[in-house]
Amino acid sequence: MAARGVGLLTRLPVCSQRRNRIPRSISRLLSCPGTIAASIGSEEQSSVVAETGIEDKTLQKKFSEVQKERREQAQRTVLIHCPNNINEKKFLKYLSQHGPVNNHFFYESFGLFAVVEFCQKDSIKSLQNGTHTPTQSTEAAIPFKSRFLNLRLKNPSSQVSGQPFVQTTNQSPPSSKKLFELLSYAESIEEQLNTLLKAFQLTEENIRLRHLTCSLIEDIAAAYFPSCVIRPFGSSVNTFGKLGCDLDMFLDLDETGKLDVHKNTGNFFMEFQVKNVPSERIATQKILSVIGECLDNFGPGCVGVQKILNARCPLVRFSHQGSGFQCDLTANNSIALKSSELLYIYGSLDSRVRALVFSVRCWARAHSLTSSIPGAWITNFSLTVMVIFFLQRRSPPILPTLDSLKSIADAEDRCILEGNNCTFVQDVNKIQPSGNTETLELLIKEFFEYFGNFAFNKNSINIRQGREQNKPDSSPLYIQNPFETSLNISKNVSQSQLQKFVELARDSAWILEQEDKNQPFSSSRQPWGLAALLLPPGSGHTSLSRKKKKKPMSEKVKGLLASIKSNSPDSSTDTSGKRTISTQA
């Protein structure tokens, strides 16, 4: 369930952890989930992205390092439901009794909430020790101690007297009306793409909240599996997530039962007594079933819990009311996390990548090419891989192939998952930046031209090698899974949906071709450039563009028919140039 009226306000850290400022060019490139600029704060973000996208990447961290830092950050954090009339200074003074506060912000979901990060985990224990279980006259409370807390005022009148309410800023993506206004006032198509990216990308606060939600669910799962880890994956961590997207997470049990090599000495070998089941799938179903029951019965704020255990990938789906996220929990989904890391690498290499992906996804959503309901539609993941493939095909390439990333990997990068070679270099700083200087305006137009004329009937898309290959089967759209190479990630796409994509891509390429690049129509407040591409089907601009595009073809057809008829013995032409039908036998 998405949050209503979500808003956030960042507060500066007060701990003694000093952070160096970084150049604006770096913060532009890294202003995405899980990067250094994200951890430093939104103040370092720049509103303009360099045209070439070739930027210094020396300060970038590995995906695993970022996720580790985020997890540790979340473990020092609590989520507090606050009264609307809370006094912020008194609130922080109260919390400081338990230890110094490193960072905090407020947001609105189903009420007012505060995310508070302490400097030490022990501060949370102190806070919990001073927290009591509520008593109800008509209902019985289940005494489950978590880091999701509820703050009540002893004397509400003393809190509001002469004190301003806490400030919140809107964390929801802009409305369609606001987006078209922003895009129409931009000075170039390049600026439009970057404006859309800035409006939709995950904020620092939203990223913190996603990791905190995973950490809260981990506390519940740890009751049965003390060494488990709940890891976010997908759009929440791969730099391509947009505000309002679902939170995908998986239960990682790899740490459970691992040997401590320092204590594994002597002549004996100890094992846990465990239950055995016929297959790993059944084990996964049983584990998720139990976790689902725990979330439903004991998880504060977890509502609408559904156990979808017979799916190809068993999962538990639920809404987390405190954060406002719709959550999907799976188990031991390591390949999905590795795919997230690969997209993180690609999204961090060049600032044009994310801008192009966000715009293509938004375009697809505007024309109902993608859907939140499972079916025959193209997925956001497929669209992202198509953009990556297109950028690999540029001259010179903007993005390297997966095989080339594998070729520069070292022993530390080696990764085999479920028999699949998932090895690629994990350090972005080892990857040579591209010398390609093409603008986003050119790239988005040529993306639509490229796939509007792609031979989908015979070729497949392969980012591992970065070249077109013959399709191994008759699927309308074949995009090879980067790691499980025998699988097609777009197997669900129907022929009709692919045809719709191709037609819309051709229309969009034509619209961009007709734009007067030197004189954007921002002064007229009419949709142009990217904004024109996002107009819904049937709107004036799109309909007109299609009519204009089809008119020359219809004239050619009419001319061809006229030529055929003029050469027929059954027709002739009078002196006015009009055709007349002969009545002669």
From Swiss-Prot:
It holds the Pfam family RL. Residues 537-585 are annotated as: Disordered. It comes from the Eukaryota. GO terms for biological process: histone mRNA catabolic process; mitochondrial RNA 3'-end processing; mRNA processing. Residues 441-486 form the PAP-associated domain. Mg(2+) binds at D246, D248. This is Poly(A) RNA polymerase, mitochondrial. Its cofactor is Mg(2+); Mn(2+). The gene is Mtpap. Its EC number is 2.7.7.19. The modification N6-acetyllysine is found at K90. PANTHER family: POLY A POLYMERASE CID PAP -RELATED, POLY(A) RNA POLYMERASE, MITOCHONDRIAL.
